[in-house]
Amino acid sequence: MADLFDEFIEPGVKNEIMDVEEAPENPMEKLDSAKKRQAREDMTNLLANMHNDVGVGNFDEATSKRARVEEEEEVEEARMENIIVHTIRTDNENCTHEVAIPPNAEFAELRENSGTEPAKYYPFQLDAFQKQAILCIDNNQSVLVSAHTSAGKTVVATYAIAKCLREKQRVIYTSPIKALSNQKYRELEEEFKDVGLMTGDVTLNPDASCLVMTTEILRSMLYRGSEIMKEVGWVVYDEIHYMRDKERGVVWEETIILMSKNIKQAFLSATIPNARQFAQWVASIKQQPVNVVYTDYRPTPLQHWIYPVGGEGMYEVVNVKGEFREDKFRDAMSGLATAGDSAGSFNKRRTGGGTQGDSNVLKIIRSVASNDGLNCIVFSFSRKECESYAISLKDMDFNKDHEKGMVKSVYESAIAQLSPEDQKLPQILNILPLLRRGIGVHHSGLMPILKETIEILFGEGLVKVLFATETFSMGLNMPARTVVFTSARKFDGSDNRYITSGEYIQMAGRAGRRGKDDRGTVILMVDSAMSADDAKQIIKGATDPLNSQFRLTYNMVLNLMRVEGMAVSWIINNSFHQFQSYAKIPEIDKKCVQVERKIASFNFPWENEMRTLVDLQDQLEATRQRIIQIQREPKYIVGFLHAGRLFKVKSGDRDFKWGILNQFKKEQNPDDRNDQIYLCDMMIAINTEGRFDPTNPATLVPGFDLPKRRWIRVPMTIDRITAISAVRLKVPADIDKPDGQMRLDGMMAAATKRFGNQIPLLDPIQDMEIKTVEMKELIAREKSLEGRLETHSMTKRDNMKDLKKQFEQKQDAVKELNALKAERKSVQSTLHLEELNNRKRVLRRLGYLGNDDALVLKGSVACELSASDELILTEMLLKGIFNTLDVAQTAALLSCFVFQDKCAAPKLATELQTCLSELHEQARNVAKVSNECKMEVMEDKYVSSFNPGLMDVVYQWVNGATFSEIVKTTDVFEGSIIRTLRRLEEVLREMINAAKALANKELEQKFEDARKNLKRDIVFAASLYL
């Protein structure tokens, strides 16, 4: 066998952490008495709202504060335990009704509305859950309504509004996004007339009895103690499950905590598994009964199909009864293209929206259309894919001539408000031919006026096929007959994972129009093998729980400290995050008892000797890991990436043993434009008993040691390599055929036999010429550790493996117990309290608080800034950075605070680059102070979060350039540009208020001029809903 391979050894080829309590002397520390009085007046109503709530009081001494915190912890734990939940009988098995009762309240039966006219009548028969929710409102009790998309939750909202209007109270309807607020305003204004809108961008009829607003506006009103809140009877929270959003969920939590106990709240939510827990939390902090009306009944049942990419036809895997059909799922997986067909795709990167993807979508749309399945929403997780798929339907037309005319009429009416030049923008012109044929696109990169036009056309049935991203599923009432998913996976910023059941349910819920369809159809495209368990988890799994995303912000801390006597820990103790944490204590205690018993059961006399042995083994493993990490560096390994070389490879915890390199290539890192990655086409042996996909490592099971194995080609990065051999094989050309597989098996057997199962490795120093000091020390350390292990007393015991196993089991149990105890301690303590103290240190160091923690002028300025980074903006204001900038430069610099998309780095003029450098300098200073005060901040990451990608675009826009001119200078989507400019206008409004707080008329005028120059043309075209 010697002629089958060539064996050769290749020739030479600490910062000190400061805990500073004292604030620096600052001439701005003393707050003007008039401004101090105003700050107190702003918060008077907030304090009144919180009357008798935990945490309000004047505690000057640190010891008093600590005592209060400990008392609050005990109260919180007792309070949670005393929330009693009663079940209320309903006449419908599809509807459950529970009510959470706090300790100071008594359970009372809800009374029917006898002798009093209902606040509102409906021209249709109400569902059971709607009747129960209305009963709660008639009894003036807060209620959480948890039901599927399109189930009819809006009925509950309109009833609460009608009740308030009848009783001469004001009512607030709040939603998570401005687009939804605009749409709701239109709907409610048509019905009730006395309706206003407040979104930041637009304020209409602010004196109305019913106010529709974003949650951020509501929070601002609560912090400022708005007089309006005194007149409010009910607040309706639409899409309350949005509270689990990582970025903005905290805003919802703040508003609920700050809301007066006298105001009743109606929460509208998609189905959530922990609805009861949420109600218990609200009941505990508001000390009032909170009802939960829950239904998983879907008026229009769903039918779920899988379309295997590369196969023929679709397979019904879940029928309208909700039964998962295992046989059909197996058929669908068999319909997938075979793994062999996927092999050899190393040089064809799998990107969505390519020819293959387009053709599969085309097949599905044709099938849906021929089976009377229109209208249809096609969800894709990429904006570019949405457009590519829409363009691929170039030969399809779903609209009749009269419908084309109606589309043109709506389209022309929509864009009539635009200037003639804006009407000729490519995005405006290019969308019309698609719309006329009944095809639409909806994603964040579209201009708002186009998104709204498409929404209206879709709602009117004039767009039959809509390609949309996930955001279309949130809030907007746009049901369809059919929903299609172009993939079961999505990239979430860090991982290309399966979509969660909650995400699937939210989007799939758009299928099935109530009163029009007898069923909704959902089609899931699957392009790689998946297990039945994964499919069940996605299609039939539970919805995502409503988990708190509470976090402290400097704006929150400063606003709560504007009034003397306000304990900031009050909002922490009343957070849903704290409530959920306390709920874990009983389960933690139960686990602790179990683990302690397990530890006591071990009888192990040689524990100390085994501990030293394991420690040596761990040190050796760590040393070897560092050696291979250095060997894998491109400057060392690339010269040894030869076809046929054997490499040991691992993927996660799966060890594939020896793999054989076929070829490698260098590519740009998609996450870092300045970095490159090395992609190896590696042949590895896998277990062929189950389904597998070479492009999806998660489906591969190691098979090197199995008699029945298969060699396949798998693309992998060099960080999967764990050892580099000195052996190269002559790889058969026909590796994908049985004969080639047999020959490769023979080569590997011969190599293993020749070297006695010890295939030689390249020596890092002698062969790879890595002659660094670190490598020499690592090799010496490796030899020393190997010698100490050979002479260790425990290695000579016959039962050493069994003893080590027992030792590791005990150690794992000890680690588990310590982790449980640490978790309980963390849960028992006031969460975020340490972070709060650290944030206060930062604020004192930077001069926002005095030594007595009283707010000074700088802190009052920061209170005005909530739309972006309040600290950096305040630092720049107080250091005069904006003083020397002109209006356009000011706006351009502020754009760095609001632009979030990725784009090519712009070439900036010297003036813009200079002011950007000043921003970065302030960011580094704040990061430095934060780290010194134990608020850990990754300095480089923090600095790079201020994105200059649109600085030049904003500079041109504020100087009068047209939209058509600025879009030519960037690769950023038009919709993203408009969204950034609108968010920038929000920041400028706050900067005007901040300049007023400083009594700086010149800066105030500069920000006002920038805002005026910004607000024009298509960027601020009025919403079609208004």
Swiss-Prot record:
What is the name of the protein in this document? Answer: mRNA transport homolog 4
A single Gene Ontology CC annotation of this entry is: TRAMP complex
Q: Which CDD domains match?
A: DEXHc_Mtr4-like, SF2_C_Ski2
Boundaries of every Helicase C-terminal domain copy: 360-564
Location of this chain's protein in the cell = Nucleus
Matching entries from SMART domains are given as: DEXDc, DSHCT, HELICc
| Gene3D superfamilies named in the record | 1.10.3380.30, 2.40.30.300, P-loop containing nucleotide triphosphate hydrolases
GO terms assigned for molecular function = ATP binding; hydrolase activity; RNA binding; RNA helicase activity
Q: Where is this motif: DEIH box?
A: 238-241
GO biological process terms, alphabetically, are: maturation of 5.8S rRNA; RNA catabolic process
> Origin organism of this chain?
Caenorhabditis elegans
Asked if the record carries the keyword ATP-binding, the reply is yes
Q: Which residues form a coiled coil?
A: none
Positions bound to ATP = 147-154
Identify the main location: nucleus
Q: Which family does it belong to?
A: Belongs to the helicase family. SKI2 subfamily.
Keywords, alphabetical: ATP-binding, Helicase, Hydrolase, Nucleotide-binding, Nucleus
E.C. number(s) listed in UniProt: 3.6.4.-
Q: Residue limits of the Helicase ATP-binding domain? A: 134-290
